[in-house]
A protein has these predicted regions:
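ABC transporter nucleotide-binding domains
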Residues: 1-123, 127-129
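Alpha-helix N-cap/helix-start and coil->helix boundary motif
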Residues: 14, 109, 151-154, 181-182, ...
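Short active-site oxyanion
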Residues: 17, 143, 172, 193-194
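Alpha-helix C-terminal capping segments
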Residues: 21, 40-41, 156-160, 184-191
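Structural motif
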Residues: 68, 161-164, 191-192
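ABC transporter nucleotide-binding domain
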Residues: 88-176
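C-terminal coupling/interaction segments
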Residues: 176-206
């Protein structure tokens, strides 16, 4: 599915899907109708009168309707409202649960983080990084706030590897950490800890 779908504007949604179904073959029309219903899509309307979002829905139905083993989608939620984006996410997860592969291109990193198991980052036409999302986030910086019962010295925390930006605000210690928090927690456990707040990293930080 291309990012900007351009197709036969004089056909209705049903006619367009029938055209592609005849090329591909083996389409389950009940499943196709279900996809259209999930997107609240009226397939009786002519393509040229549809909004950008509805054209995108037609494209998504066309991409999913024959249950391909590999889906290649470029900016698939382009033009979709938030509710329809959520529906697409569910459909993508269903496909992967069934053992099919979804290859997704997107500039919306929150969307990639929500759907993908692995992520590749392309810069100037070259893949500069490819890794599982969980592993990538584990390497990212996270913000920690440790609330102590009373003020503590920051010296021991400043000396820990991977820990930076350490400062205290009364009895609250703030820091940024890369990687494991084990060493930090061991130091903190020497004092009376009231609460720990962790601001988890997202892909936008990487």
């Amino acid at each position: 599915l291309p990012g900007d779908l351009e197709t036969y504007g004089n056909l209705t949604g049903w006619e367009l899907l029938t055209y592609f179904a005849n090329i591909r073959g083996g389409v389950d029309w009940h499943y196709t109708e279900t996809l259209a219903e999930r997107f609240a899509l009226d397939l009786s309307r002519t393509i040229r009168v549809l909004s950008k979002g509805n054209k995108q829905k037609v494209g998504l139905v066309q991409a999913f309707m024959h249950r391909p083993e590999l889906l290649i989608l470029d900016e698939p939620t382009n033009g979709l409202d938030p509710l329809m984006q959520q529906e697409f996410y569910r459909m993508a997860r269903e496909a992967t649960t069934e053992g099919r592969t979804v290859f997704l291109s997107s500039h919306a990193l929150a969307e990639v983080e929500r759907i993908a198991d692995r992520v590749g980052i392309i810069r100037e036409g070259q893949i500069v990084l490819e890794e599982e999302v969980v592993a990538l986030k584990a390497k990212a910086l996270r913000q920690l706030e440790i609330h102590f019962a009373e003020p503590v010295s920051t010296k021991a925390f400043r000396e820990l590897p991977g820990v930076r930006g350490v400062f205290a605000d009364n009895s609250i210690l703030h820091c940024t950490i890369e990687g494991s928090v084990d060493a930090l927690i061991k130091i903190a456990s020497q004092f009376e800890v009231v609460n720990i707040t962790s601001h988890e990293p997202d892909l936008l930080q990487d």
